[in-house]
Regions:
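Short beta-strand->loop
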Residues: 90-95, 105-108
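Conserved active-site loop region of the serine DD-peptidase/beta-lactamase
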Residues: 113-131, 149, 153-183
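Active-site helix/loop module of the DD-peptidase/beta-lactamase fold
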Residues: 14-52, 82-86, 110-151
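Soluble non-cytosolic domains of exported or imported proteins
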Residues: 2, 18, 35-38, 71-75, ...
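Active-site SXXK
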Residues: 1-20, 44, 104-108, 159-162
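Short, solvent-exposed loop/turn and secondary-structure capping segments
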Residues: 9, 55-59
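Amphipathic alpha-helical interface segments
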Residues: 62-86
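Acidic/His-rich structured neighborhood in mature extracellular/periplasmic domains
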Residues: 5, 82-84, 88-91, 99-101
Length: 183
């Protein structure tokens, strides 16, 4: 989830996504007419999308069974999104769930030149990783990045060090990292 947020920051800094305040449906057409249609990237990355009536039955619950269903190929990300059609948002409280990360990843995949694969490759190159990394996609080609990024321990460390370096820099991505929660 943290790496998706980082790559989102790069997409914003590169101009592929205009701002954290943009609606997800402006980037992922399948979000139109769903519970998430008017959710901003800020809402999604901070897990405050107003989806407690869909993603869990209780605010703050992590019981949403999305991940298991998608990994076992019982449903695709797109099918889960469609199930939220015609639902209304609830109060925007923190509600941890994996689905929101994958929705943000889909937007980056659609709008970044070269897609999410290129965005992650750029991140890996900048960090100086040395081994192959990969992530899983569902049957429709939607990325599953809520927890399915694979890399060596050393490369994960290099990615973390790069995030730390960027945090401490006076750059667009540094400002994004320092201000994502308060933006």
């Amino acid at each position: 989830k943290s790496f998706v947020s980082y790559v989102l920051g790069n997409a914003i800094c590169n101009g592929d996504i205009k701002s954290l305040d943009d609606k997800i449906s402006d980037y992922v057409p399948e979000a139109k007419g769903t519970l998430y249609e008017n959710s901003s990237f800020k809402d999604l990355t901070n897990m405050r999308a107003g989806d407690t009536n869909f993603a869990s039955r209780k605010a703050g619950s992590a019981t949403f069974i999305y991940a298991g269903q998608v990994i076992q190929k019982k449903k695709t990300v797109k099918e889960y999104l469609a199930e939220s059609s015609n639902l209304k948002t609830t109060k925007k409280v923190f509600n941890y769930n994996n689905f929101l990360t994958d929705l943000v990843a889909r937007a980056i995949d659609l709008k970044s030149p070269g897609g999410l694969k290129k965005a992650y490759q750029d991140f890996a190159d900048k960090a100086g990783t040395s081994s192959e990394m990969f992530f899983i996609i569902d049957d429709n080609g939607w990325p599953l990045l809520h927890g399915w990024t694979y890399a060596t321990r050393e490369d994960f460390l290099k990615l973390g060090i790069q995030v730390s370096k960027d945090w401490n820099s006076n750059t667009c991505i540094g400002d994004y990292l320092k201000n994502i929660v308060s933006m």
